[in-house]
Amino acid sequence: MSSTKRARNQVRLSRALGLPLTPKAAKYFEKRPYPPGEHGRARRRTESDYAVRLKEKQRLRAQYGIREAQLRRAFDEARREAGLTGEALVELLEMRLDALVLRSGFARTIAQARQAVVHRHVLVDGKIVDRPSFRVKPGQVIQVKPRSQARTPFQVAAAGAHRDVLAQVPEYLDVSLEKLRSELVRRPKRAEVPVTADVQLIVEWYAR
């Protein structure tokens, strides 16, 4: 799939889900904040409870760019933890390596963060990790590989060019952007994680 087609699909998905998933989608979303399609602007019907819960699950999936099976596994793990399942779900997803690469400002989108990991540009505690789903533990250090830091995308990131579209660095990360290095200092708390999701609706979806 070409980058142009991928970007177009992200714009369409953003409009369908009601939230911008990429910086480019955000610009289009400002102009057309309604679902895609011939009758998108005119749609006013009330959604069923089923549709509302399904959409909320899809919104969370899209923000992390993960498959249904991955979200289901994370939910099953969250359900085994103490406390609120929905909050635990987001906290576990946020500790994915690709998510933390994005939050650290080393990439502009979750897709770019995943690509950096898959292409073996990212180290965890000095060792290459090429699995975007890798669970980072508190105290572990994420860094762009020294040989990769000279590449243009990472030079752009180190200069802080993505800060115009990314949320402020959350308190669970200690980031040295110029060194393309960050540390997960503690487990994220749901309230700190910059994703839009009604987690209770997602819990209700899986509890059907």
From Swiss-Prot:
One of its GO terms (molecular function) is structural constituent of ribosome. Belongs to the universal ribosomal protein uS4 family. It holds the Pfam family Ribosomal_S4. GO terms for cellular component: small ribosomal subunit. This is Small ribosomal subunit protein uS4. It comes from Beutenbergia cavernae (strain ATCC BAA-8 / DSM 12333 / CCUG 43141 / JCM 11478 / NBRC 16432 / NCIMB 13614 / HKI 0122). Keywords: Ribonucleoprotein, Ribosomal protein, RNA-binding, rRNA-binding. One of the primary rRNA binding proteins, it binds directly to 16S rRNA where it nucleates assembly of the body of the 30S subunit. With S5 and S12 plays an important role in translational accuracy. The keyword ATP-binding does not apply. SUPFAM superfamilies: Alpha-L RNA-binding motif. InterPro entries: Ribosomal_uS4, Ribosomal_uS4_bac-type, Ribosomal_uS4_N, S4_RNA-bd, S4_RNA-bd_sf. It comes from the Bacteria. Residues 28-48 are annotated as: Disordered.
